[in-house]
């Protein structure tokens, strides 16, 4: 298995010249692992030659975060592998806080362009010691040369072209790709979400910081105008305005005129009006039926005596009480203004009064009717007519009196027997039903 020399983590090398060599010059060595904005040159990003599937394996390491892009290794994933001069000049990874190098397996690309073989940490430590000496000498030269050749546009937010939490590429590495590389080869970059390098990647694979503060301040503004809004680049985005407040659904009058609430009476007002209306109606001498008939004749709304009674007793619904109140109030005002003189209300009330005046029977007449009832509780029509003529009463009055007397007798008779002397009363009557015969009371 032929492998080329690799840097600390994953220097990408191949015989097909995947990466371009650059003039001697190391990269920065520090705990932060950041590069300045001037350290990125256009020559760092060469187009990847399509020799198979470079960086196609799912568990290849992205060794180039945006803060530690290797010098001369831009064609291999955004400054990912270092490798100045094609042989690997420096390590983009920072050492651990305890002074020990952070050891991770590296990826070496074979002659056929595949990077499936992983090397252990022993070979990486030897290579790292050799590269540290060259890196210190090339650091200043690298910075001076790149300051002169730095293109105006280096930062490209490739993350905007592939939004969504499911994207596996690191936003930090994609932040340093040029526009041509970000559009064509952005899908080739992957990151392992379960590893954390100096706090740059979180446990869920989300980058803690996209790129260096200097690069962000220098290049974010002109590029944000050409891309869609990014959630990290617009922290002060205004939320949508809240919807206008609406009234509760149980109050339909919330959006009507302000005067509608004033016209609607309260329950206390209805109770007070019903009490006053009943007192005035009785004082004026009108019955509930008279009021209902007058409302129907005058205003076109016929109400029964039961409706007026329920209004006075506050037994109607609140809605019906509110509808009936103005009509009754109007009738009451007209009745008060016309008191003492015959008006249309009096005429209508007289027409509506169909109840006959209560008949009062004298004591002597009542005694004669009572004696006749003892003889014959249910007289015939001829007997009622002759009795009415003898007592100087109307026939209807005599008939109603006998009906009421029979109902009274039925209420006074106990269920298990008859009153004393009942056999004498009902014994000779031909109209007596069989169950009215003489019965022996239960002892």
Curated annotation (Swiss-Prot):
Residue spans of biased composition, Pro residues class: 237-251
CDD domains: homeodomain
Keyword list, A-Z: Activator, Differentiation, DNA-binding, Homeobox, Neurogenesis, Nucleus, Phosphoprotein, Transcription, Transcription regulation
Biased composition annotated in UniProt, kind: Basic residues: 225-235
Compositionally biased spans, kind Low complexity: 125-149, 161-171
Keyword set includes Nucleus: yes
DNA-binding region as annotated in the record: 354-413
Cell compartment(s), UniProt: Nucleus
GO cellular component, one term: nucleoplasm
Biased composition (Gly residues): 67-90
Tissue expression remark: Expressed specifically in the neuroectodermal cell lineage.
Lineage: superkingdom: Eukaryota
Basic and acidic residues compositional bias, start-end: 215-224
Main location, first listed in the record: nucleus
Oligomeric form and interacting partners: Interacts with PQBP1. Interaction with ISL1.
Function: Transcription factor that plays a key role in neuronal differentiation. Binds preferentially to the recognition sequence which consists of two distinct half-sites, ('GCAT') and ('TAAT'), separated by a non-conserved spacer region of 0, 2, or 3 nucleotides. Acts as a transcriptional activator when binding cooperatively with SOX4, SOX11, or SOX12 to gene promoters. The combination of three transcription factors, ASCL1, POU3F2/BRN2 and MYT1L, is sufficient to reprogram fibroblasts and other somatic cells into induced neuronal (iN) cells in vitro.
Family of the protein in this entry: Belongs to the POU transcription factor family. Class-3 subfamily.
Protein name: POU domain, class 3, transcription factor 2
Organism: Homo sapiens (Human)
Encoding gene per record: POU3F2
């Amino acid at each position: 298995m032929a492998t080329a020399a690799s840097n600390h983590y994953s220097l990408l090398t191949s015989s097909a010249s995947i990466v371009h060599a650059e003039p001697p010059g190391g990269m920065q060595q520090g705990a932060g692992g950041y590069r300045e904005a001037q350290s990125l040159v256009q020559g760092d990003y060469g187009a990847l030659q399509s020799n198979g599937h470079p960086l196609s394996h799912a568990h290849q390491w992205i060794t180039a975060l945006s803060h530690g892009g290797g010098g001369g290794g831009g064609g291999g994933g955004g400054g990912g592998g270092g490798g100045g001069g094609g042989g690997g000049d420096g390590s983009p990874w920072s050492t651990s806080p305890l002074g020990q190098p952070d050891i991770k397996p590296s990826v070496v690309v074979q002659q056929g362009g595949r990077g499936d073989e992983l090397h252990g940490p022993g070979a990486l430590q030897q290579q790292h010691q050799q590269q540290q000496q060259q890196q210190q000498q090339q650091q200043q030269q690298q910075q001076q040369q790149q300051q002169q050749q730095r293109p105006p546009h280096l930062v490209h937010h490739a993350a905007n072209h592939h939004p969504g939490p499911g994207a596996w590429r690191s936003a930090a590495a994609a932040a340093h790709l040029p526009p041509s590389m970000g559009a064509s080869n952005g899908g080739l970059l992957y990151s392992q979400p379960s590893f954390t390098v100096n706090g740059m990647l979180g446990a869920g694979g989300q980058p803690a910081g996209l790129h260096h503060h200097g690069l962000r301040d220098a290049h974010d503004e002109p590029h944000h105008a050409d891309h869609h809004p990014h959630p990290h680049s617009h922290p002060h985005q205004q939320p949508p305005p809240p919807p206008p407040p609406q009234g509760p659904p149980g109050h339909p009058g919330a959006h009507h005129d302000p005067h509608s609430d004033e016209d609607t009476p309260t329950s206390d007002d209805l109770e007070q009006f019903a009490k006053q209306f009943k007192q005035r109606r009785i004082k004026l001498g009108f019955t509930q039926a008279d009021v209902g008939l007058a409302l129907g004749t005058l205003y076109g709304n016929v109400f029964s005596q039961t409706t007026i009674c329920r209004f006075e007793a506050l037994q109607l619904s609140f809605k019906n009480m509110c509808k009936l109140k103005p009509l009754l109030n109007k009738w009451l005002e007209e009745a008060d203004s016309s008191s003492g003189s015959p008006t249309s209300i009096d005429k209508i009330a007289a027409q509506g009064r169909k109840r006959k005046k209560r008949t009062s029977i004298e004591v002597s007449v009542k005694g004669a009717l009572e004696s006749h009832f003892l003889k014959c509780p249910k007289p015939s029509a001829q007997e009622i007519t002759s009795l009415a003529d003898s007592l100087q009463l109307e026939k209807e009055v005599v008939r109603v009196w006998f009906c009421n007397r029979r109902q009274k007798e039925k209420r006074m008779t106990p269920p298990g027997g008859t009153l004393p002397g009942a056999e004498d009363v009902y014994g000779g009557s031909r109209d007596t039903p069989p169950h009215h015969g003489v019965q022996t009371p239960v002892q």
